[in-house]
Design a protein with these regions (language model features):
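Glycan-recognition/cleft segments
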Residues: 94-115
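Secreted extracellular polysaccharide-interacting domains
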Residues: 57-71, 103-105, 120-130
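Extracellular/lumenal carbohydrate-interaction signature centered on repeated Trp-anchored short motifs
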Residues: 69-80, 99, 130-138
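Long, internal low-complexity/basic segments
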Residues: 5-90, 161
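Short, aromatic/His-centered strand-loop micro-motif at the edge of beta-sheets
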Residues: 120-140, 147-148
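Beta-strand acidic-aromatic groove motif in beta-rich domains, primarily in extracellular
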Residues: 90-95, 153-156
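Short beta-strand segments enriched in hydrophobic/aromatic residues
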Residues: 84-86, 118-120, 145-147
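Carbohydrate-binding surfaces in secreted/extracellular proteins
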Residues: 136-168
Length: 168
């Protein structure tokens, strides 16, 4: 049980596990341990990026984008901006997406061109595509949605950009 001190019976095992913990902690960059309490709450003091600031949100590669964990973009104008690096020979894949089979949106590159798809409950898919391929190199891509307004789910206009230039 937890009331029995296993360390007294197995000091070698304790030393082995302490050593293993330290090896793994170094391997996964968790040392030095940050034992600050209040300071860790403020990203600026803690030395990490602030993921949400005002009406902007910062996402990193591989982050899960759950509906209730990001800014609400429904029924309002908004934009999504991403910095990408396109290899020689082009790129293909998802840049950022939110939602799933029953609704959501995705900003992605397909056939070398930036595309945006809005999935309306699996009933209808609205796709906007760039007119030109995304060239090799570092680029900033952006999707702007201008909401038509006047109530819920009234639609709007999507414009795609490469490095500040409208492409679709």
């Amino acid at each position: 049980t937890q009331a029995h001190n296993l360390v007294a019976d197995n000091p070698e095992k304790l030393a082995e596990l302490q050593r293993l913990w330290l090896i793994e902690a170094v391997k996964y960059n968790v040392v030095p341990l940050d034992d600050r309490g209040f300071e860790r709450i403020n990203p600026d003091i803690a030395g990490r990026p602030q993921l949400i600031r005002g009406n902007s949100q910062l996402l990193f590669s591989g982050m899960r984008v759950s509906e209730n964990c990001i800014l609400n973009m429904k029924n309002k104008s908004h934009q999504v901006t991403a910095n990408v690096v396109v290899p020689e020979g082009g790129a293909s894949g998802v840049i950022v997406t939110q939602g799933g089979q029953v609704g959501g949106w995705s900003l992605y590159v397909h056939d070398g061109k930036l595309k945006y798809c809005y999935n309306f409950f699996g009933i209808q898919y609205f796709i906007t595509a760039a007119d030109t391929p995304l060239p090799a190199g570092k680029h900033q891509v952006r999707m702007e949605f201008a909401y038509d307004g006047g109530g819920l789910a009234k639609g709007g206009t999507v414009t795609l950009y490469y490095d500040g230039n409208a492409v679709g």
